[in-house]
């Protein structure tokens, strides 16, 4: 079996899944104290990198996703699967776990 090189462009979410690049978490507090990784809040904001074709309805039609590539979104804190690609953090989650489009 040949090795597959994973990049953002080779990840194709299925169904209503959305692939999001996670925004960087704060490295230090407002008072200037550096935070260790274990003390950082898990980010809940990111940019949509890839979008699946949409949820399959009972009649066989597809429900078009409400987000597009490039949208900045707010998502549920513990939703989805965390993925690391090329040093960047991503999360793969269902569209229902997206709470809002930001900006």
From Swiss-Prot:
One of its GO terms (cellular component) is cytoplasm. One of its GO terms (molecular function) is unfolded protein binding. One of its GO terms (biological process) is chaperone cofactor-dependent protein refolding. InterPro entries: Chaperonin_GroES, Chaperonin_GroES_sf, Chaprnonin_Cpn10_CS, GroES-like_sf. It holds the Pfam family Cpn10. It is found in: Cytoplasm. It comes from the Bacteria. Keywords: Chaperone, Cytoplasm. Heptamer of 7 subunits arranged in a ring. Interacts with the chaperonin GroEL. Together with the chaperonin GroEL, plays an essential role in assisting protein folding. The GroEL-GroES system forms a nano-cage that allows encapsulation of the non-native substrate proteins and provides a physical environment optimized to promote and accelerate protein folding. GroES binds to the apical surface of the GroEL ring, thereby capping the opening of the GroEL channel. Belongs to the GroES chaperonin family. NCBIfam families: PRK00364.1-6, PRK00364.2-2, PRK00364.2-4, PRK00364.2-5. This is Co-chaperonin GroES. It comes from Prochlorococcus marinus subsp. pastoris (strain CCMP1986 / NIES-2087 / MED4).
